[in-house]
C-alpha cells in the first residue's frame, strides 16, 4: 500500500518539497541558508505577533508601550529582543544566501533569482517600517530622512511624500500606516518565499561544481533534514547568545530617547544591515542621483544572469573571478563601515571610491574576468 504522505493532497506537497525531494549529493553548508531564512521568518512572525498584542501604534503611547512590554509583560524583554536581533540574524542569513548565489552561479535559475531579489526588497521594506515603530529618536528621524528621498522624484515627489506621511510631517498617521504595513508584509514575504521554492523545485538545486547533478541525487530526508537541523541549532545558539548577553549591541542608543521633532540627532543612520546602501546614497552629492544609486545597488542583482559571460556556471574553478568576488565582499564591508561614519574627510572620499568600485566590479570587472578565463582555457 502506498504511504499516505505520497497520496494525500496536502502531505504530497510537503513530501515532494522536504522529504522525497531529489537533492544533489554534494551541496555544502552554504545551501543551509534557505532553511535558516525560513526559520527566521517563522520566528519573526511569532515574536512579532506577541509584540503586536501589547503594542499601540499612537505617537503618544508607542514608546511607552514598548517600555511596558520590556518591563511588565511576562518575558516581554525576551520577545522584544528576539524580534529586534532576529531581524539582524535574518539579514546575516540573507546576505550569505545571496553571496552563495553569486559565487556558485545560482542566478542562472532566473525566475527563482528574480523572486529572491523581490523578497530582498520586501524584507528590507518590512525591516525599515519595523524600525520606526518604537518611536525613538532614530525611528522618527530615520523615517523622516528615508521617506523624504521620494521627494527627489521629479514633479510628483513632494505630493508623494506627503501622501505617504498622511500629512505635512511624520506623525500619528505615518506611524499607524507603518504598523499596518509592517504587520501585513511578512505574510506577503511568506507567500513570495513559497513561489521562490516552487520555481526552485521546477529545476532542482544548483551545486558547488555548477554541473548537472541529475546523475547523482539523494533524498532530502534524512540527509539534509539533519544537516539543516545542525545549521538551525548553530543559528539559534548565536541568536540566543546575542539576545541574552548583549541585546543592544547592534541597536542605536538614540532610540532609547523618545521621538522629538524639534531635536535632530547628531548622526542619523539606519540599522547596520542598511549601512552599505546608505553609504552609496550619501556618496552622490545629487539627491535624485543618490536615490537612483541606492535603488540600483540592489536592483543590479537582477542583471546578474545577463552579465554572466563565463562558460562555467560556478566560480569554483575560476580563480580570477574568485579574487574579484572576495574584493566585492570586502568592498561591501567597507561601505557598511562608512555608512555608520559622520560625513567628513576622509570618510566621504572612501565612501565614493567604494561605491564606484561596487558598480565597477559587478558591471565591468567580473564579466571581463569571466571572458579572460574563457580565453585562458581556450574555450
From Swiss-Prot:
Origin organism is: Scapanus latimanus
Protein name per UniProt = Cytochrome b
Instruction: Quote the function comment for this protein.
Output: Component of the ubiquinol-cytochrome c reductase complex (complex III or cytochrome b-c1 complex) that is part of the mitochondrial respiratory chain. The b-c1 complex mediates electron transfer from ubiquinol to cytochrome c. Contributes to the generation of a proton gradient across the mitochondrial membrane that is then used for ATP synthesis.
| TM ranges | 33-53, 77-98, 113-133, 178-198, 226-246, 288-308, 320-340, 347-367
Q: What is the lineage of its organism?
A: Eukaryota, Metazoa, Chordata, Craniata, Vertebrata
Q: Where does heme b b566 bind?
A: 97, 196
* Residues the record lists as binding a ubiquinone: 201
Tell me where it resides.
Mitochondrion inner membrane
Q: What else is known?
A: Heme 1 (or BL or b562) is low-potential and absorbs at about 562 nm, and heme 2 (or BH or b566) is high-potential and absorbs at about 566 nm.
Alphabetized UniProt keyword annotations: Electron transport, Heme, Iron, Membrane, Metal-binding, Mitochondrion, Mitochondrion inner membrane, Respiratory chain, Transmembrane, Transmembrane helix, Transport, Ubiquinone
Give me the comment on cofactor binding: Binds 2 heme b groups non-covalently.
Amino acid at each position: 500500500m502506498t504511504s499516505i504522505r505520497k497520496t494525500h493532497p496536502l502531505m504530497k506537497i510537503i513530501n515532494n518539497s522536504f522529504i522525497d525531494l531529489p537533492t544533489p549529493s554534494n551541496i555544502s553548508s552554504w545551501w543551509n541558508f534557505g532553511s535558516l531564512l525560513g526559520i527566521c521568518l517563522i520566528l519573526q512572525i511569532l515574536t512579532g505577533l506577541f509584540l503586536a498584542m501589547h503594542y499601540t501604534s499612537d505617537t503618544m503611547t508607542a514608546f511607552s508601550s514598548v517600555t511596558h512590554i520590556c518591563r511588565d509583560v511576562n518575558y516581554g524583554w525576551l520577545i522584544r529582543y528576539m524580534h529586534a536581533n532576529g531581524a539582524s540574524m535574518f539579514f546575516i542569513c540573507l546576505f550569505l544566501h545571496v553571496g552563495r548565489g553569486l559565487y556558485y552561479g545560482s542566478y542562472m535559475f532566473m525566475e527563482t533569482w528574480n523572486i529572491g531579489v523581490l523578497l530582498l526588497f520586501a524584507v528590507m521594506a518590512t525591516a525599515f517600517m519595523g524600525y520606526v515603530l518604537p518611536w525613538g529618536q532614530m525611528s522618527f528621524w530615520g523615517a523622516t530622512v528615508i521617506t523624504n528621498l521620494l521627494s527627489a522624484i521629479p514633479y510628483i515627489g513632494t505630493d508623494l511624500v506627503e501622501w505617504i506621511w498622511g500629512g505635512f510631517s511624520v506623525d500619528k498617521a505615518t506611524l499607524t500606516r507603518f504598523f499596518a504595513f509592517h504587520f501585513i508584509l511578512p505574510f506577503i514575504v511568506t507567500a513570495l518565499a513559497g513561489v521562490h521554492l516552487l520555481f526552485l523545485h521546477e529545476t532542482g538545486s544548483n551545486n558547488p561544481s555548477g554541473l548537472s547533478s541529475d546523475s547523482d541525487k539523494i533524498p532530502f530526508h534524512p540527509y539534509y533534514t539533519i544537516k539543516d537541523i545542525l545549521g538551525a541549532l548553530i543559528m539559534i545558539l548565536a541568536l540566543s547568545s546575542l539576545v541574552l548577553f548583549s541585546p543592544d549591541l547592534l541597536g542605536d542608543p538614540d532610540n532609547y530617547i523618545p521621538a522629538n521633532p524639534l531635536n535632530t540627532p547628531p548622526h542619523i543612520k539606519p540599522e547596520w544591515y542598511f549601512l552599505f546602501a546608505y553609504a552609496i546614497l550619501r556618496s552622490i552629492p545629487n539627491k535624485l542621483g543618490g536615490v537612483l544609486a541606492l535603488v540600483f545597488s540592489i536592483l543590479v542583482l537582477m542583471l546578474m544572469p545577463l552579465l554572466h559571460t563565463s562558460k562555467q556556471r560556478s566560480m569554483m574553478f575560476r580563480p580570477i573571478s574568485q579574487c574579484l568576488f572576495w574584493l566585492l565582499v570586502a568592498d561591501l564591508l567597507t561601505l557598511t563601515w562608512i555608512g555608520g561614519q559622520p560625513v567628513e574627510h576622509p570618510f566621504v572620499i572612501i565612501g565614493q571610491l567604494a561605491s564606484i568600485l561596487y558598480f565597477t566590479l559587478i558591471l565591468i570587472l567580473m564579466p571581463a574576468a569571466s571572458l579572460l578565463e574563457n580565453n585562458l582555457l581556450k574555450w
